[in-house]
Amino acid sequence: MKNVEFSLERGQRLKMPARKLREIVSPNQGNKLAVVEDELPRVPPALAANKRLAVETRTSSNGTLCGSLDLTSARLYHQPLLESPPASKKSDFSKDAVVRQLPLNKTEENNAPKANDIFISQYTMGQKDALRTVLKQKAQSMPVFKAVKVHLFEDTSTEKNTVAQETETPPNRIDSATTVAAATAAAIATAAPLIKVQSDLEAKVNCVGELLTKLQETDKQLQRVTEHQASVQSKQEKVHCHDHDKQMNAFMEQHIRHLEKLQQQQIDIQTHFIDAALKASSLQLGMSTSRAVGKYSGKLGSPSVGSSVFSHNTFVSKRVPLSEDTDFDGQKSPLETPAPRRFAPVPVSRDGKITKRESPTEEKENMEMNSPKGNVRLLEQVLNSNECLTRKTESSDITSLTQPKMGWNLEKRDSTETLHSQIFPSSEERGTAQVPVPKYNDVVHDLGQKKQASDMLQIKQSPVTLRLSDHPHNPALLQTTNTRSVLKDAAKILRGVQNNKKVLEENLEAIVRAKDGAAMYSFINALATNREMSEKIRIRKQVDEWIKIISAEIQDELMRKDYEQKRFDPKNQRNKKALTMSRDIKANNQEKTVNRSVIPRSHYQKQTQEQFTSPPVRNLPASGPQKERSGLLKSATTLQDEDYMLQIYGKPVYQGHRSTLKKGPYLRFSSPSPKAKPQRPRVIELVKGTKVKSAKTQTDFHAASRMKMDSKIQHPITALPHADQQYMVSPSREMPTVSGTLEGHLIPMAILLGQTQSNSDSMPPAGVTVNKPRPVTVTTSIPPASRKGNAGVKKPNVAIVEMKSEKKDPPQLSVQILPSVDIDSVSYSSTDGASSPPSPKEASLPPLHTWIQTPDFMKVDEEEVPLPGTNFDEVIDVIQEEEKRDEIPECSAPMLEFNRSVKVVPTKYNGPSFPPVVSAYHPTTDILDKVIERKETLENSLIQWVEQEIMSRIISGLFPLQQQARLDASVSVSEASEPSASDIVAGTSSGALQRMVDARVPVNSDMVSHFVNEALTETIAVMLADREAERQRAAATSVPGDLSGTETNLLARVCAPVATPQPTPPCSPSPVREHVRVKTPDSSPCESDPDAASSIKEIRVEKGSDMPAVMLVSTPTRTPVATPPPAAALTPTLSETSIDKLKLSSPELPKPWDSGDLPLDEENPNSLQELPHPRAVVMSVANEEPESVDFSAQPAPPEPAPSAPLPEGTKAPSLQRVPSSGSSTLENTLSTVTETETLDRHISEGEILFSCGQNLATKRPGDLFLMNINDSLSSTLQDALEMEDDPPSEGQVIRRPHKKRHEDAIVALLTKQQRELLVSQQEEDLDNSVGELSEGQRLVLKAAEDISAGPSGQMLPPTSPAEPSYQHADPRLVLQQSDMASGNICEDLCASHGPMSLRELELQPDSNLILPITHTTTAVSDGNLPEAAEDFSQYQQKQDSDIKQVEHKPIQRHLTSVRNKPDSTLSQHQGGPADLLLIAHVSPARMSVTLPSANLEDCSQSLSTSSMHGGTESSGTDTF
C-alpha cells in the first residue's frame, strides 16, 4: 500500500505489511486493485466496524456475492484496512473501491462498518476482476464437481459401454474390437477410481480451502482482539500513569500547603515575639501591615509560591536526580548535575514577583527562539511541563495564602517568603533545569522519601523564617520612624538576619544536598533491587536520546543565535563569534559534565567534531550557518578537490601508506585507521614476465614522490569498496571515461597469458596471490613500443588473479585500464617465472613460484631495493630471479604470486645451465610450442628414466633370469619380465618416475609399463648383446688370470677375498645362460656404451691382469667382465659414467663430471686410486660403488688360488662369462649411471639421475643417487624374491646386529657357502624363479648387506678363504637378505656363496657372484665395515645354513638375478658375492674400508653399495 499510514500507538503492533497483502491478492484482482486504490484511496471511518460482516456478506460493488474465495480476499484486505489511514468520508465508501487504508484507531472504534470495508477492500484489489475471478473459480469449481460426478457416472457408463461393446463384439468376432473394448474398459476401470480420488481430493481441497479461509478470518479476528486488548491496556496504563501523575501533583500540593501552614505558624510565632519586642510600634505596624495586605496580597502568592516552588523543586530535584542516577549509574549529586540551562540563572531580587516575572519572560524568549524552528524541543517540553507544575502549585499556594490574616503577619510572611525565594531561586531553577525527564518524575519519586525531605526542609526553614521574620518589619519600622533606636535595632537585626540568612542558606543547601543525596541513593538502591535491568536500560537509553536531542538543540540554538548575531550586528561579529565560541565551549562543558557518563565517548567526540566542523544535517531544520556549511560541502563535492577524492577513493595505491593515509584521493578498502606499520599493497606489474616489482617499490612511502610515469601514463582505477565494484570494458579507450564505479563497467586490462594448464606439464595461468587485504592495484603498464619485442597482433590479455586475503576484508583489486597490449610483447614467462624454457631440458626445472612483474615503466629512483626482475638485465636470467625470489624481502604489502604449478622433481634437473639466458620475447604461439616441448621433454625424460632405471633393474633381473633361462630359459625369462614390468609400474608410480611427472598428475601405470616394455625390449636386447659380446671379449681377451686381474682391478676397489673365487663346480649351467645372454644381447649392442662396457670389462680384466695376484679378483673379474656390456646397454649415460669409472682403472676413462678433477676422489666414480685400497669412507653415495673397490682392495688370500684356476681357459671364460654377467650387472648399474650421460645431458650438481628403480651408488656431492630408488628397483624383483625362499620377507630390511665378526668367521662362512654352493646350484635349478639366483649363485652379501641380512648369512662357517665368499652365504639368502635390507635389491642374488673352484667358476658362469659379494662388502665399507664384516659373518653364517640348503643350486643365477634387482641390487649382486668373498677373505678392517665415491659410480658394484645404502635401508644405510 503506497498510502498506508500507521498511528504511532498502533503502528508498532501491525504485523502484516501492506505489500504482502498486495502480493497475496490474485493477479486478476491485483491489476484493478491498484486502479481502485488510486480512485478511492480512503474508506470512510464508519466502515471499519463492518470488516467482520464483510467477510460474511461480501456484497461487491457489482452486487454479486463473493464466495469462499471472497472470504480469502476479504482476509487479504482485512489487515490493509486496519493499516489504512483514517477514512475520509462515507461518501468515499459509497464508491465501490475498497480502501485498505483505514486507520487502526478508527477501524477498531468502528467495527460495524468494517465488514463493508472488508468487502470493498476485497474488491479494492480490483473488485470487478475479483468478482470475475471468484465467479470463474466458482464456475470452474462447479464444473470440476460436475466433472467428478460425470466421471463417476462415466465410470459406470463406461462399464456399461464396455459391456455393450463386448456384446457387440462377439457377433463381430473381431479380436481387435475386443481388445479395444477391453482396453477401454480397463482404462475406464482404472480411470474410475482415479476420477473418484480426484473428485474426493478436489472436494477435500475445497474443504481445506474453506477451513483455511475460516482460520485466516479467525486469525485476523484474534489479531484484532489482541491489538484491541493491547491498545486498551496501553490506554489503561497511560490513564494509570496520568492518574498517578495527578495524585502526585495533588500530594505535592498538599505537602506544600502543609509546609506553608507550618511556615505561617512559625511566622506568627515570630511575629508575636517581635511584637513583644516592639511593644510601642506594634499597633502602627499592624496598621501598615493591613495596608500592605492590599498592596502585597497579589505579591504574597508569588513569594509563597517561591517558597512552595522551592520545596516542590527540591523534591523535583530529588526525583530528577534519582531518575538520572538510576539511568546513569554515576551521577549521584542531582543538585550539581543540572541539565544544560536554556539561560543563565537570573539572580533573584528580594521581591519574589521579580523572579516570577523574569523567568516567564525568559521562558517566553526561549520559546520564541525555539519557535522559528517549528519544533517543540524536548528540553522546552520538559521545562514547560515543569513550569506548569510549578504554576499549578503556585495557584494552589495563592489560594491558600491569599486569605488575609494579621496584615503585618502576612507582610512579614511575604518578606520572609521573598527571602526564601531569594534563598532558593537557584534551587528553583535547578529544579526546572533538572527535569529533562518530567515523565519519570512521577515514576521515580518516592513519596516517603520526599516526606522526610520535606519535613527536614520544614525543620530547616523554621529557623530561617524565624530570623527572616525580623526583616519584613524593617520597612514598616522605616515608615514609622518614631524612634531611631528601633531603627537601629532593626538594622542590627537585619544585618544579623542577613548574615544568618547566608549561613542558613549555605547550611540549608548543604543539608538539602546531603538529604537529597541520601534519599536519592536509597531510592536508587530500591530501584536497583526492585527494577529489572531491561527497564533501567530502557530508561537509560531514553535519557541518552533526550540528552542527545537536547544537546543538538542547544548546539543548533547556539548556532542560530550566533548566526543571527552575525546578521543583525555585523560590527560585533568578531566579538559575537568569540561569545558564541565561548558559549559552545560552555555548552560543551556542561554537556560533558552532564552527559559524559551517559553519552559514550565516541558520541561525544562526534558531537564535538560536528560542533566545530560542519554540523551534520539533522532532522531539525538546518540553521543558517548549517545551510551555509552544507552549501560549502556541496561546492566542495562538485569541485571534487583532492580531499574529497581522498575521502571517496582513499589514497591511490601507488601512494602506498603515506602518513596522509586518509587524505589519499584514491579508493581504500576500509580506509583502515593508520596502523603502526600500514600494509602496503604489493602491486606487481607484469610485462614480459621478466621484471618483478613488488608494490613496495611502487607504493613505498618514498616511492610515491619518486613515481615518474615513463612512456605511458598509468591510470590507477579506484576500486569500489568491496562488492560494489563493477567493471565496464571499453577496450577502445586507454582510460575509461568512468573510473570503474559504474555497473557493468569492465576494465580492459593487459594481462599476460600464462601457459594453459591443460595438463601437468603445462603451466597454469599465473595466480596472482594477494596476501594482504589492502586494495591492490594491478597496474599492468604497457611496455614502451621499443620494449615490444614482437609487434604481433594485439590480443586480449587475460590473467587469472587469485586474491588470497589474509584478513577478513577481501582486497579490492583495482584494475588499471590499459590499452590492449600485444601479448607477444609481454612474455608469458611472467606466469612461468621465466620465459618458457628454450629447450626441453628446461621442462624439468623444478616448479618455481616466480615473482614476476612486468617492468615498471614508472621510473623509480635507485633508492628502491630492486626486487628480482626490476632490472631488465636481471630479467635475462629468469632462473636466477627464480632463485632470488626466495630472497625477495617479504613486505607487509600483498604480493602477487604467479604460481607455476608444474612441479618437476627437483631431484632430476635436465635443464640448461643454471642461469639460463632468457629467450627473446616469444609470441603467444610460441607458448604452446614451449608447453609442448616441455611435455615432450618430460615424456622423453620419463621414458629415459624408465629405460635407465627399469632397464637397469630389469636387465639386472633379466641376466639372472637368462641364466635361469639357460636352465629354464623361457619360463624364467617370462617370469622375470612380467614381475619386472609390474614392479616397474609400481616403482614408477610409487616414486621415481612420478617425480618426473607433474606432482598432481598420477603416472599411468599402463603407459609406463608400455614405455618400459618397449624400451626394455630394445635396451635389453642391446644390452644383452653387448654383454654377450663383452663377456666373450673378456673371455677371449683375458685369460682366467686376466679375468682375475680384471676382477682384481674391479675388485681392487672391492678387495674381493681371494678365497671367494672358488666356485662350486656345478656352475656349468650358468655358462649356458651366459651364452644365451650373449646371444640375445649380441643382436643389438647397447646404446649407451656396449663397447665402453666391454672395454670396461676388458679394463677390469686388464686391471685384473694388473692385479692377478688376487685370486679372488679373478672371480670378481669374471663378474665385472660380464657386467659391463649389459650395463652399457642398460643405461648408456650411466654406462658412460661407469665406463669412466672403469676407465678410472685405466686413466683413459673420462671423468663423469665432464670437468676437472672431482673435489673428492670418492666423488670421482672413475678414480683409479680407489681400486687398490680406497681409504675407508663413511658410507656416502660414492661409498656404495667404492665398497666393491674397498673389498677389492681387501683381497682374500684364498682368492688367488681360485684366480689361478680361473686362468684355465675353459673355466676362465665361463667364469669370465659368469663374472661378466656379474660385471655386466655392475656395468649395467654403471651403464645405468652413464646412460644419462650417454644421453649427452649435462647433469647439474644438484641433479640426481636415477634409472627407474635403480639404486645408484650415491655420488657424494654431485651425483647423489637417491637410495630410495633401490626400493622401486627392488620392487620389480620383489615378486621373484618372494618366489624365492628368501628368509627375509620381500622388501623386508633385515638389520643384522653389527656383531664384530672376524675374518675367520667370514672365512668359515665362505667355506660353508662354498660347500653349499653345489647344493644351492642344484636348488637354484629347482627353486629359483627367473629373477632369482639360487643360493649357491647368490653373491655373498656385502658387509652392509650381511648386516642387513643378519647373522644368518654371517653364521655360515668359512669353508675356505676363497670359497666362503661364494658358498658360505647363500647368495640368495645373503643377497636377498641384503636386498631386503637394501630394499630387496639383492633379493634375486643367487650367486654361489663362498669361494668356488675354477671348475665351479667355469661351470658356473655366475661366479660373478664373487664381485657382488665383494660389492656387498663394499657397501658395508666405512667404519661400519668391521661391523658389517661381523654382521656379514653372521649373515653368512645364516646364509651358510641357508646356502647349505641352497648351495647345491647352480651358481648360474648369481649376478643375473642381482641385475633383476635395481642397479644397486645388481651392483650388490655383482659386488655382493665378490664383496662377500672379499669379506670372507678380508678382515673386518678391510671390510670397514669405505669405497671412494668415484669407484662407486665407476663400478655398478657401487650400485650394490647404493642398494646397500638405499635399498638395504637398514642394512646398508643403517650400517653406515
From Swiss-Prot:
Biased composition (Basic and acidic residues): 350-367
Coiled-coil ranges per UniProt: 487-519
GO biological process, one term: cilium assembly
Region (Required for centrosomal localization): 485-572
Lineage top rank: taxon: Eukaryota
Assembly notes: Interacts with CEP120. Interacts with CCP110, CEP290, CEP97, KIF24.
Protein's UniProt name: Protein TALPID3
Taxonomic lineage from the root: Eukaryota, Metazoa, Chordata, Craniata, Vertebrata
Gene: Talpid3
